[in-house]
Structures are given as C-alpha cells and as structure tokens.
C-alpha cells in the first residue's frame, strides 16, 4: 500500500433545518395559536485521530465530506431532528490546515483526539417565536443557517520515537531491518527508500518504541533539493535522532555536518534533539579512530553516543539498541520528575491560596465582632 502523507479535501457541514409556520387546528378552537416547530441543527464535520489509520491514502479516492442537514420543523410544535455528524478518521500525528491561508487549525497527536473542523448551521425558528400581544398569528419563520464549508489540507507527521537520518545509501534501511521486524526495500544505490518506513523496536523489560527511516536527505533538502524535503517534517516529533553515516565514505564527518545543517535549517530546535552518531559499514573500512575525539568535541557530541556498527553483519547493533533504550528511559524519568515537580508546585499554590482565604475570612469575622 502506498504511503500518502499529504491530502487536500473539501468539507461541508450540514445546513440547519427551516422553521415552520403552522397554527393549531382543533375542533372548537377557531383561532388556534402558532405551533410551528424549529428546524434541527446541521451536523458537524469532526476529525478523529485514530491509530487504525496509518496513511492518508483514502483521501485519494474521496475528497469531499459532507454532514447531514437538519430536518425542517413541522406543525404541532414538532422540532426537526439534528443532522448526523460526519466523522473522519485520520492518522494520529496529523496537522490540519486551512488550504487557502495555510493557518494551522488543529494538531491531533493523541489517540481519540477530536476536532470540529466545520460547524453545522443552527436551525431556523418556528412562528411561535414571533408571536406577540399585537400579532397573535405570525406568518413568519426563519430559515436554517448554512453550515460551514472549506477546503482543508492535512499533513501527516509520523509519531516515531526514533528517527534514522543520513545521506542516501548510508545503510539506514538495512539498519532498520536489523533493529525491527520491518522489511524495507534495500539496494546499493541512492534513493532506494522513496517513502518513510516504520519499524517496532522491542526491548526486554521495557516498552517498545517506533523507529522511522526518513528517506535520504541531501545537501539543500530544506530548499527542495532531492527527496528529503518532502519528509523533513517527519523528524519533528521524534525524541531521538540517529545519524547514520557511511564510515567508508570519502569524508564521513562532512556527511554528518550536511545532515545536521539541513535539520537545523528546517527547524532550529532539531539541533538540540538527543543525538546518536552511528558510523556504519565498519566491516568494510578500517576507520581512523584517532580523528574521532576532536570531531566529537567540536560537534558537542557525547562520546558514549558515538558507535561503530555494521548493519549487514549485526556487529554493534546490540549496543545501539541498549543505548536507545537507556536514553528513552532517562527521558521518561525526567518527564516524570518534571510532572511531579509541577504537581507539587500546583499543590503548594492551592495551599497558599487556601491559607489566604482563611486569613481573609478570619479578618472579616474579627471586624464583624468589633462592630457588634
């Protein structure tokens, strides 16, 4: 199945039902009052983030989504039923934009998260609303309001914990297949991977994590060169970036700098993302490790986060798995620690507010006692 991470489509919320002009027609009641019902509200168009949907491919075959209009009001004070909402399942990690302005309307990054992308029109009012002392037989009702309609753009940003980045033919796809059960297309020529590939990395005694192989970036990718510009947004949500460098290349350090510059040019905060440097194909080339300390220091890397591996033979892959797991564990610990600190500060704030309220209450009671 093709991987589609961008789609344009049209949504139309339901129009409101019209109000009704009607009067009581009963035996022995020659001049019955108005009893026209109100129109029902039009249905909304609602987007729902669902893990069951992995791609936007369905939008290739259906580009228009419409909610049901509200039912018209009827006589005998019968109000119209509201129109049924139109629910759209989209992948978790989708960003919804206004197609014309490019303004971000929603970022659905949690399972089950919902967003009303188009509001249904309100129902029209029946003629009882227009009855008055001077007009007991109003022959007027209002029409329902039109539902919202608009063209929208969805961009999918993969919800991966780890992103594999590197120049074409650095060995990312082979590494992904070693790390997970994924089976990406692998060959010895650039741009074999034409779309992001996902794999699941399982740890003993830990939760699993998702790894994404981002298609080969090249110099100038953030400006539209090569294929990488189409997929740079998929690295935004990753917790860890694994830079896969071909150790047998003419200048592997330069290759690292190219990717680092592209990520930084696309979004500055990516420069501060947790990084692992993997020098791949160490079985094919005797790398001069004496050059490594100066490079690590100049780029601000942590020595323990620099590994030599061979994705083909599996050499060093176990160390990489352990390192990824350790970094994720540390991140989760720091997140939990921060959350608990925020809760502690919130509780302290509430405690001080309560003490202040009690103090004011006591002062008020003392003042009342003096007045008495």
Curated annotation (Swiss-Prot):
Binding site for GTP: 166-173, 191-195, 213-216, 280-283, 310-312
The protein's required cofactors: Mg(2+)
Keywords: Cytoplasm, GTP-binding, Hydrolase, Magnesium, Metal-binding, Nucleotide-binding
Gene3D superfamilies noted in UniProt: GTP1/OBG domain, P-loop containing nucleotide triphosphate hydrolases
Main location: cytoplasm
Location of region: Disordered: 121-141, 346-372
Keyword field contains Nucleotide-binding: yes
Residues annotated to bind Mg(2+): 173, 193
Domain Obg: 1-159
OBG-type G domain ranges (all copies): 160-329
GO cellular component annotations of the record: cytoplasm
One Gene Ontology MF term: GTP binding
GO biological process: ribosome biogenesis
Subcellular location as annotated: Cytoplasm
EC number(s) per entry: 3.6.5.-
Protein task: An essential GTPase which binds GTP, GDP and possibly (p)ppGpp with moderate affinity, with high nucleotide exchange rates and a fairly low GTP hydrolysis rate. Plays a role in control of the cell cycle, stress response, ribosome biogenesis and in those bacteria that undergo differentiation, in morphogenesis control.
Protein family according to the UniProt entry: Belongs to the TRAFAC class OBG-HflX-like GTPase superfamily. OBG GTPase family.
PANTHER family assigned to the protein according to its UniProt record, in alphabetical order: DEVELOPMENTALLY REGULATED GTP-BINDING PROTEIN-RELATED, MITOCHONDRIAL RIBOSOME-ASSOCIATED GTPASE 2
Subunit field text: Monomer.
Protein name: GTPase Obg
């Amino acid at each position: 199945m093709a991987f589609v991470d961008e789609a344009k489509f049209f949504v139309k919320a339901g129009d409101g039902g019209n109000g009704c002009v009607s009067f009581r027609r009963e035996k022995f009641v020659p001049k019955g009052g108005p009893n026209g019902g109100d129109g029902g509200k039009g249905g909304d168009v609602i987007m729902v983030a669902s893990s069951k949907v992995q791609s936007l491919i369905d939008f290739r075959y259906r580009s228009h989504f419409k909610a049901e209009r509200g039912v018209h009001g009827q006589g005998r004070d019968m109000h119209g039923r509201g129109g049924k909402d139109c629910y759209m399942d989209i992948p978790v990690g989708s960003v919804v934009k206004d197609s014309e302005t490019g303004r971000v309307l929603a970022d659905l990054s949690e399972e089950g998260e919902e967003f009303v992308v188009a509001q249904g029109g309100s129902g029209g009012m029946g003629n009882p609303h227009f009855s008055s002392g001077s007009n007991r037989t109003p022959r007027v009702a209002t029409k329902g309001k039109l539902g919202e309609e608009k063209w929208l753009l969805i961009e999918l940003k993969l919800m991966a914990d780890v992103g594999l980045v590197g120049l074409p033919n650095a060995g990312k796809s082979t590494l992904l297949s070693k790390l997970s059960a994924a089976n990406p297309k692998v060959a010895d020529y650039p741009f074999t991977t034409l779309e992001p590939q996902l794999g699941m990395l399982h740890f003993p005694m830990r939760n699993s994590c998702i790894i994404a192989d981002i298609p080969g970036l090249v110099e100038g990718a953030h400006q539209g060169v090569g294929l990488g510009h189409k997929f740079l947004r998929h690295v935004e949500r990753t917790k860890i970036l694994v830079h896969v460098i071909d150790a047998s290349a003419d200048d592997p350090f330069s290759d690292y700098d190219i990717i680092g510059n592209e990520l930084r040019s696309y979004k500055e905060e990516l420069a501060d993302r947790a990084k692992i440097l993997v020098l791949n194909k160490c079985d094919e080339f005797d790398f001069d490790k004496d050059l490594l300390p100066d490079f690590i220091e100049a780029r601000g890397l942590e020595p323990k986060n620099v590994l030599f591996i061979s994705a083909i033979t599996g050499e060093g892959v176990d160390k990489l798995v352990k390192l990824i797991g350790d970094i994720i564990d540390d991140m989760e610990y720091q997140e939990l620690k921060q959350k608990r600190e925020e809760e502690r500060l919130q509780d302290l704030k509430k405690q001080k507010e309560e003490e202040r309220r009690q103090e004011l209450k006591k002062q008020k009671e003392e003042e009342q006692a003096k007045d008495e």
